[in-house]
From Swiss-Prot:
InterPro entries: Ubiquitin-like_domsf, UBX_dom, UBX_domain-protein, UBXN8. Residues 1, 55-277 are cytoplasmic. This is UBX domain-containing protein 8. Residues 64-89 are annotated as: Disordered. Interacts with SYVN1 and VCP. Pfam families: UBX. Its main location: endoplasmic reticulum. The chain crosses the membrane at residues 2-22, 34-54. Residues 68-89 have a biased composition (Basic and acidic residues). Highly expressed in gonads. In testis, expressed in post-meiotic round spermatids, while in ovaries it is expressed in granulosa cells.
Length: 277
């Protein structure tokens, strides 16, 4: 395309010269003048041919170098792209490690502190303790095995807090029948398929959760008997509902249904305040 443009340029520049010569030679145009004009034209064509050949060869020599430059640019662009990809991967790995090692622990610690503060404000710090759930078959055996030891240790600790006389850990044989009489036996637990039955979960201060089924028509005093049987004396501890949080009013002549326990309920064992003694 460049060689054709050069040829056209030379032809356009030669046309005015030819027209000028023809005008000059028209009045006295002879054979000699025609020969000279023809020679000039051939000389001009020869010069044009030489210029075209030189220009064509020069352009052909430039093409390989331009192709080589393009290949070099492609290689450089490819290398730059690979470097950018590696840098992005390295930055992504750094960001993921920062999130895993720094941000997540900070967020978990912040959530834990907020949870502790929330439970401290609501008075439910027992939720922060690690408890375990007993199977139904193990509950009765757990009651029998731990009632005596829990009764002595927990009541002794509560007595120290409230400046009450500490119960003696050594019980004489003569006093043991009195203790058994003070902690009455619970009625037999009804089956799951029985009607008018509710399940009560007893959440202890040490985080332990015990469950038992009761008939709605039973006397509400059975809840206090159950609390004493698992080791929390009614003179030092009381029962309260979870939500809304209020003390459970257990009266001698009221049934479970009368005090509002008509569905499955969770009750908390709480230590009585000293002012209430």
């Amino acid at each position: 395309m460049a060689s054709r443009g050069v040829v056209g340029l030379f032809l356009l520049s030669a046309l005015p010269l030819l027209c000028l010569e023809l005008r000059r030679g028209i009045p006295s145009l002879g054979i000699k003048d025609l020969i000279l004009l023809s020679g000039r034209i051939f000389l001009l064509l020869a010069l044009l041919t030489l210029v075209i050949s030189v220009t064509t060869s020069w352009f052909n020599s430039l093409k390989p170098s331009q192709g080589h430059l393009k290949e070099g640019e492609k290689e450089n662009e490819k290398r730059r792209r690979l470097v950018r990809e590696r840098q992005q991967e390295a930055q992504g790995e750094k960001a993921s490690r920062y999130i895993e090692n720094v941000l997540k622990p900070q967020q978990e610690m912040k959530l834990k502190k907020l949870e502790e503060r929330f439970y401290q404000m609501t008075g439910e710090t027992w939720k922060l303790t690690a408890g375990h759930r007993l199977l139904e078959g193990d509950e009765d055996s757990e009651f029998e095995n731990s009632s005596q030891a829990s009764f002595e240790t927990i009541n002794g600790e509560a007595a120290r807090r409230q400046n009450l006389p500490k119960f003696s850990t050594e019980i004489s044989p003569a006093a043991r029948p009195l203790l058994r009489k003070e902690v009455p036996d619970l009625p037999e637990e009804p089956s799951e398929t029985a009607e008018e039955v509710v399940t009560v979960a007893l959440r202890c201060p040490n985080g332990r959760v015990l469950r038992r089924r009761f008939f709605k028509s039973w006397n509400s005093q059975v809840l206090l008997d159950w609390m004493m049987k698992v080791g929390y004396h009614k003179s030092l501890y009381r029962l309260s509902t979870s939500f809304p949080r209020r003390a459970l009013e257990v009266e001698g002549g009221s049934s479970l249904e009368d005090i509002g326990i008509t569905v499955d309920t969770v009750l908390n064992v709480e230590e009585k305040e000293q002012s209430s003694q």
